[in-house]
């Protein structure tokens, strides 16, 4: 039986674990955030929405995810 590796990453300063392989798009889907207006920063660099599917998440990565909230 083959087990996928566990990735240890940080999301908004909180340690988390996910099965590998993982992209930003898959991470957002697993977190229930796909389709929302948000910004993703990976290790200090903004990840454009057009690159979410192609951007891998790797062990030790630090992600900041900010969800836009409407209001006034």
Predicted features and spans:
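Ubiquitin-like/PB1-type beta-grasp interaction modules and other compact soluble beta-rich domains
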Residues: 1-71
């Amino acid at each position: 039986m083959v087990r996928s590796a566990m990735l240890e990453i940080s999301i908004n300063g909180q340690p988390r674990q996910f099965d590998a392989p993982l992209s930003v798009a898959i991470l957002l889907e697993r977190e229930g955030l796909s389709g929302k207006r948000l910004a993703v920063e990976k290790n200090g660099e903004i990840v454009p929405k057009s690159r979410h599917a192609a951007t891998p998440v790797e062990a030790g990565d630090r992600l900041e995810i900010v969800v836009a909230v409407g209001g006034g």
